[in-house]
Amino acid sequence: MSWHEVDMAADPRGGQFAYFRQMVDPFAGVTAAVDITDFLAALDGRPFFLSLLYAVTRAANRVPQLRRRILDGRVVEYDWCSPSYTLMKPDGVYVYSLIEGERTYGDFIAEGQRQQVLSLDRRTLTEDGDPLGNFFVSCLPWLD
């Protein structure tokens, strides 16, 4: 995955970065309850989770700051971040699945279905590719 270094001395948020990088865990996660009534109505038989994952991935990638990571003490911005997400196998064990690269909706769904089948053969949580260049996504519909 390609990325470029961000000049934090010239970045408007450089001071905030300098402050937060001193913290033990200077990273953020986002959890939100979202009304997806209209989204569900528009699915028309298409796979729910992969369709939602496609929409969330595209939306997150539109925000450059969400593609930024700390690599060897430097801030880098990935050109595109791929979704890595959890799947529960029939035996109750969780594994990761990854859909790499920017894709059209149809290709994303097809690759997601292929990766889910491949992921079912895994025995543990292992990460593929460059984990820094991923968005880590979990869907927990039973919490609300």
Predicted segments, located by residue:
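Acyl activation and transfer enzymes in specialized metabolism, enriched
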Residues: A41-P64
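N-terminal beta-alpha "docking/capping" segments at the starts of catalytic domains
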Residues: M1-P47
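A short, aromatic/hydrophobic, helix- or strand-capping loop or linear motif
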Residues: Q65-D72, D121-E127
